[in-house]
Regions:
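Structural signature of hydrophobic alpha-helical transmembrane segments
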Residues: 42-52, 111-120, 203-212
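Long hydrophobic alpha-helical segments that form multi-pass transmembrane helix bundles
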Residues: 136, 142-216
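N-terminal signal-anchor module of multipass membrane proteins
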Residues: 1-59
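Short, amphipathic, aromatic/basic-enriched membrane-interface segments that mark the entry/exit
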Residues: 11-21, 62-67, 82-92, 108-112, ...
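Short hydrophobic alpha-helical membrane-embedded segments
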Residues: 20-28, 90-99, 117-122, 194, ...
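C-terminal ends of transmembrane helices
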Residues: 56-72, 79-82, 125-136, 217-220
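Hydrophobic core segments of alpha-helical transmembrane domains in multi-pass membrane transport
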Residues: 28-35, 50-60, 104-106, 122-125, ...
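A generic, well-ordered mixed alpha/beta core segment in the N-terminal half of proteins
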Residues: 75-82, 93-168
């Protein structure tokens, strides 16, 4: 019997890593699309920045990980590039950071400043994933690591929410979310939000936190 040593996940069925990643993207799509409808500029800008940083960091990491060792042999740029990326940089190295970028975008508020998104995305992918060895080796969720770092460093900006046509109550600009109020220890604090509004997402919160209806659609 031949024992093959590979990184997780280890599967014994037809589904593969690529298929699982696509399933995750499909599940996230309803919430992401609705976020783009409600906050078109904020969502798209944050998403593009997160995608560029996380996929770019993955690309650089693969190149450094598989580069030629230092020696006296002269090689062309093409040879070095093919050695680093051919067979090593696959569709999974695009899909996995893309998923992290989408999740990171959805767990950040629409009003988050661009510099917080940039720093959070970079810290998330590097500290949360790449330092552990990359795909299949990380023990933390890169999106969660990035969000926590951004929240710790830019706490005041993190609780700033942008009123829109969908949710334009004046006091929605800043303050605690329903989840934050529950975390404060009292369910009574959330009675200011009608159940229908909480279900439809007409409450303050991060992009992917408030739209319960689209989250359920993604689950289905």
């Amino acid at each position: 019997m031949t024992i093959i040593k590979e990184n997780s996940p280890h599967l014994r069925r037809k589904a593969n890593v690529t298929r699982m990643m696509m399933d995750v993207l499909i599940a996230l799509a309803p919430t992401l699309i609705f976020s783009c409808v409600v906050y078109p500029v904020n969502t798209i800008v944050n998403l593009v920045i997160s995608l560029a940083i996380m996929i770019g960091a993955e690309f650089v990491f693969i190149g450094l990980k598989n580069m030629y060792p230092k020696d006296d042999v002269k090689r062309t740029f093409k040879d070095k590039f093919e050695h680093s990326y051919k067979g090593n940089f696959t569709i999974n190295n695009i899909l996995t950071p893309a998923i992290s970028a989408v999740i990171f975008t959805l767990i950040m508020p629409a009003g988050a400043p661009i510099y917080a998104v940039i720093i959070g995305a970079l810290v998330g992918i590097v500290i949360g994933k790449l330092v552990f060895g990359g795909l299949g080796s990380n023990i933390f969720n890169p999106a969660a690591v990035g969000m926590l770092f951004a929240k710790l460093c830019f706490g005041s900006q993190y609780v700033t929410y942008v009123p829109t046509w969908y949710y334009s109550i004046p006091d929605a600009a800043a303050g605690a979310t329903p989840l934050g109020l529950i975390n404060g220890g009292s369910l009574a604090n959330i009675t200011q939000y009608p159940l229908l509004d909480m279900f439809l997402g007409r409450i303050p919160g991060t992009l992917g936190e408030v739209y319960k209806s689209t989250i359920i659609i993604g689950l289905v």
